[in-house]
């Protein structure tokens, strides 16, 4: 069959156009109707128009259906027939937080991201009916224009892009194509379970709407497109405002937000959270973020969870924190100092120390870092966490309480317990990357050690 001039061209031409210059694709392949049609179209494209097209398929084994193993076998046979490399990935689903559907989707896209090669783009097979369902589900949740934008035909994904080339076509069109090409596909019996919201819409709601209004799905897609346009316009209009309100550490100025209207402030907050990879907050979460975190009394240490991220406030700025690994020990022995074999007055430097809770590595280096006095031969070096008592630091004439020291140096509360403290014996020598105590001060014109903390990009 010559697909360039035949009826299936209605599906093939948009796919050809959307691929552009991309010649390496990874296809999400469940074995169902939609992804089978997409994979077949790509095979035809490779045969007739783009012989250099490199196609890989990925099948996600969710382990939720008794037939899952037989689906893997079907996908392997199909890919073998079409000479396509197939990757099968087994995932574990944890439905406790957002339910099975959301958990499966999250696991699926994590697997896609982990297996997407350097030059590849990801292709998935959502169609017009899926778009309509997504719009209605967002409407049910009370979403704004961002949520009602539903699914984009093209969007950034991992280090590359995600393309949905079938988004403008109904399931009926795909089914007609599959039957005409005598394709075989899997029918997932769980799709008939209307306890799931998406199935409920597909089985019980959309047939009635489409019977009454045959072009309901197309109209819904147009509305989703208009919402997406409005969001894109807001992104462009607010980009400069967001940049002006952000500090070098990507914290957000509360004083700057106070100058904005309520609507503009909410829009900026949403974009700030999205730019840092947080899930879209609900209206209630956004109100709590402002009232309970940003507007909390000055001596409070407010916090709010959004997904797995934590919003905190410090010095009139908002911070979005990644989940922080727990520090399970407050004391880490490092080394007992030994004399150098050449009888040098400078003892041997200890080997680098790997810190717990993803805090990086401490080491002594030949130059740079923090200059501290050398440890004496036989002196025990350790690292501890949790500054306590009165501290005398270099550059201050008087001792200060530990809390005052952190405040004066501008260290946010959530970082204070995660900063390694260097001890020689029972003497505090330095807080890595922050200060050196008078007890740890290197004497001028005398040899010294240089403490370097190779820490992760974000301490919190």
Swiss-Prot record:
Q: Which domain of life is it from?
A: Bacteria
Q: What is its main location?
A: cytoplasm
Q: State the top-level EC class.
A: ligase
SUPFAM superfamilies, sorted: Adenine nucleotide alpha hydrolases-like, MesJ substrate recognition domain-like, PheT/TilS domain
Q: What is its EC number?
A: 6.3.4.19
Note the Pfam families from the entry: ATP_bind_3, TilS, TilS_C
User: Does this UniProt record's set of keywords contain Glycoprotein?
Assistant: no
Q: Which SMART domains match?
A: TilS_C
**GO BP terms in the entry:** tRNA modification
Compartment annotation: Cytoplasm
Question: Which keywords has UniProt assigned to this entry?
Answer: ATP-binding, Cytoplasm, Ligase, Nucleotide-binding, tRNA processing
Q: Which reaction(s) does its UniProt entry say it catalyses? A: cytidine(34) in tRNA(Ile2) + L-lysine + ATP = lysidine(34) in tRNA(Ile2) + AMP + diphosphate + H(+)
State the similarity comment.
Belongs to the tRNA(Ile)-lysidine synthase family.
Show the PANTHER family listed in the entry: TRNA(ILE)-LYSIDINE SYNTHASE-RELATED
What's the entry's take on its domains? The N-terminal region contains the highly conserved SGGXDS motif, predicted to be a P-loop motif involved in ATP binding.
Q: What does this protein do?
A: Ligates lysine onto the cytidine present at position 34 of the AUA codon-specific tRNA(Ile) that contains the anticodon CAU, in an ATP-dependent manner. Cytidine is converted to lysidine, thus changing the amino acid specificity of the tRNA from methionine to isoleucine.
Protein name, UniProt field:
tRNA(Ile)-lysidine synthase
């Amino acid at each position: 069959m010559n697909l360039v001039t035949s009826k299936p061209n209605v599906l093939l031409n948009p796919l050809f156009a959307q691929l552009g210059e991309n010649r390496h694709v990874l296809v999400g392949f469940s074995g169902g109707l939609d992804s089978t049609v997409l994979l077949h179209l790509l095979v035809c494209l490779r045969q007739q128009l783009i012989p250099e097209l490199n196609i890989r398929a990925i099948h996600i084994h969710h382990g939720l259906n008794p037939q899952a193993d037989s689906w893997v076998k079907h996908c392997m046979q199909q890919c073998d027939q079409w000479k396509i490399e197939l990757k099968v990935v087994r995932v574990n689903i944890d439905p406790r937080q957002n339910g099975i559907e959301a958990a499966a989707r999250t696991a699926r896209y994590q697997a896609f991201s982990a297996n997407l090669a350097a030059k590849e783009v990801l292709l998935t097979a959502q169609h017009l009916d899926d778009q309509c369902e997504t719009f209605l589900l967002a409407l049910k949740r009370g979403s704004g224009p961002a949520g009602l934008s539903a699914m984009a035909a093209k969007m950034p994904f991992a280090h590359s892009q995600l393309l949905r080339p079938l988004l403008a076509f109904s399931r009926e069109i795909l089914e007609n194509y599959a039957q005409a090409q005598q394709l075989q596909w899997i029918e997932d019996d769980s799709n008939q379970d209307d306890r799931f919201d998406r199935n409920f819409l597909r089985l019980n709601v959309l047939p009635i709407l489409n019977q009454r209004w045959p072009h309901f799905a197309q109209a819904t897609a147009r509305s989703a497109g208009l919402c997406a346009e409005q969001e894109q316009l807001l992104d462009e209009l607010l980009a400069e405002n967001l940049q002006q309100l952000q500090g070098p550490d990507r914290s957000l100025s509360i004083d700057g937000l106070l100058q904005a209207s309520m609507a503009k402030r909410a829009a900026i907050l949403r974009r700030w959270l999205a730019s840092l990879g947080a899930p879209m907050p609900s209206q209630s979460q956004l109100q709590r973020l402002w009232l309970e975190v940003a507007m909390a009394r000055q001596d409070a240490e407010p916090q709010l969870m959004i997904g797995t991220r934590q919003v905190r406030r410090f010095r009139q700025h908002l911070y979005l924190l990644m989940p922080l690994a727990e520090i399970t020990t407050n004391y880490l022995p490092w080394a007992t100092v030994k004399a150098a074999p050449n009888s040098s007055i400078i003892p041997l430097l200890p080997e680098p120390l790997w810190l717990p809770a993803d805090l990086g590595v401490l080491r002594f280096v030949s130059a740079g870092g923090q200059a501290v006095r050398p440890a004496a031969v036989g002196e025990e070096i350790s690292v501890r966490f949790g500054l306590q008592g009165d501290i005398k630091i270099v550059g201050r004439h008087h001792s200060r309480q530990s809390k005052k020291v952190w405040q004066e140096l501008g260290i946010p509360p959530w970082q204070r317990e995660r900063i390694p403290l260097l001890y020689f014996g029972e003497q505090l020598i330095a807080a890595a990357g922050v200060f050196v105590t008078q007890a740890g001060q290197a004497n001028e014109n005398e040899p010294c050690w240089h403490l370097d903390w190779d820490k992760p990009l974000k301490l919190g």
